[in-house]
Regions:
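Phosphate/nucleotide-binding beta-alpha loop and adjacent structural elements of enzyme active sites
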Residues: 1-235
Length: 235
């Protein structure tokens, strides 16, 4: 089986930036962390998840309990699920068109919060890989992190094909921004599906009569512009 480890020198360490770093699922870089090949700088404003991250990863890695965005005050829309809260309001009428979607994104409360721009954080260092999952605010994170993006080699971001949150950026918006900033679409790592109500096939689960709602998309540095990268990055 092909392995990234074969491409990395023994002393190579990948600098990872994770925005929305909760432990809801296994991180795509987890094996690199387990073998000492990656250092993570993560942002997770949920207090319980933030403490879990610090406990799980230890002092080698850095985590901050911050909302990352455009640097302005914003409203955080708390929901009944700690992993579906967002800086954008849930689009409940749309969510109610599908099985098992609105029930996971039920509004609970609103909180005024401060957001931080990635480019305003001085000690992030030279980042190689970015992973983003912030429920509709992905483009806000990237737009306000263009200094950081200059050295990034790959990005894994959640993208949406339906407006689950009012005013959120769609897949086409993220794609246009990333291509304009020197990245090319590489692949999709799985889709989120939901069947329309009231249609349901118990034998097929959520993939019956389905709609593709979201996905994790991977972008890589434009291979036609590799001359713009430093020798260290190319190695």
């Amino acid at each position: 089986m092909w392995s990234l480890f074969r491409l990395l020198d023994d002393g190579c360490r990948v600098e990872v930036l994770d925005v929305g770093a909760s432990l809801a699922s296994t991180a795509p870089y987890q094996k690199l962390v387990e073998t000492g090949r990656a250092r993570v700088t993560g942002f997770e404003p949920n207090e319980a998840e933030y403490e879990r991250l610090r406990s799980s990863y230890g002092l080698t890695h850095r985590f901050y309990p911050l909302f990352v965005g455009d640097g302005k005050e914003a409203t955080f829309h708390e929901t009944n699920n700690p992993f579906t809260g967002s800086l954008y309001a849930p689009n409940t009428p749309l969510l109610e068109k599908f099985h098992a979607l609105a029930s996971l994104v039920t509004p609970v409360a609103e909180h005024r919060v401060a957001t931080t721009c990635l480019d305003d954080i001085a000690d992030l260092g030279d980042i190689d890989f970015i992973k983003i999952d912030v429920q509709g605010a992905e483009l806000d994170v990237l737009r306000n992190g263009q200094r950081i993006l200059q050295g990034v080699l790959a990005i894994q971001t959640e993208v949406n094909f339906l407006e689950q949150y009012h005013g959120q950026a769609m897949f086409s918006d993220l794609d246009a921004f990333l291509r304009a900033n020197g990245f090319q679409f590489h692949c999709v790592l799985g889709y989120g599906w939901r069947p329309f109500l009231p249609l349901l096939n118990p034998r097929a689960g959520v993939k019956a009569f389905n709609q593709q709602v979201w996905a994790d998309a991977v972008y890589v540095r434009d291979w036609m512009q590799l001359d713009r990268l430093s020798a260290e990055k190319l190695e």
